[in-house]
């Protein structure tokens, strides 16, 4: 009888903790490795174009930006 009560209480506790943690993780990715992969994909060095203020000597500027301020060191991407 005591064992049954302990098991029931344990199951209820585990169920409640699962429901509580499910609310906190809503809208987040399930696996950390997937989040890290997305962060690496969006990393500044992984882009094929230069963002605002970045040099445009070795790579083209991103859409909506133009390479300005030539000179010896190359220009920078500006709107």
Curated annotation (Swiss-Prot):
Residues of the signal peptide: 1-22
Keywords noted in UniProt: Disulfide bond, Knottin, Secreted, Signal, Toxin
Keyword field contains Cytoplasm: no
Tissue: Expressed by the venom duct.
Disulphide bonds in the chain: 49-62, 56-67, 61-77
Gene Ontology cellular component terms for the protein in this record: extracellular region
GO molecular-function term, one example from the UniProt record: toxin activity
Location(s), subcellular: Secreted
Alphabetical list of InterPro entries matching this protein: Conotoxin (IPR004214)
Residues making up the propeptide: 23-47
Keyword Secreted: yes
Pfam family, one: Conotoxin
Entry remark concerning the domains of this protein: The presence of a 'disulfide through disulfide knot' structurally defines this protein as a knottin. The cysteine framework is VI/VII (C-C-CC-C-C).
Family: Belongs to the conotoxin O1 superfamily.
Protein name per Swiss-Prot or TrEMBL: Conotoxin 8
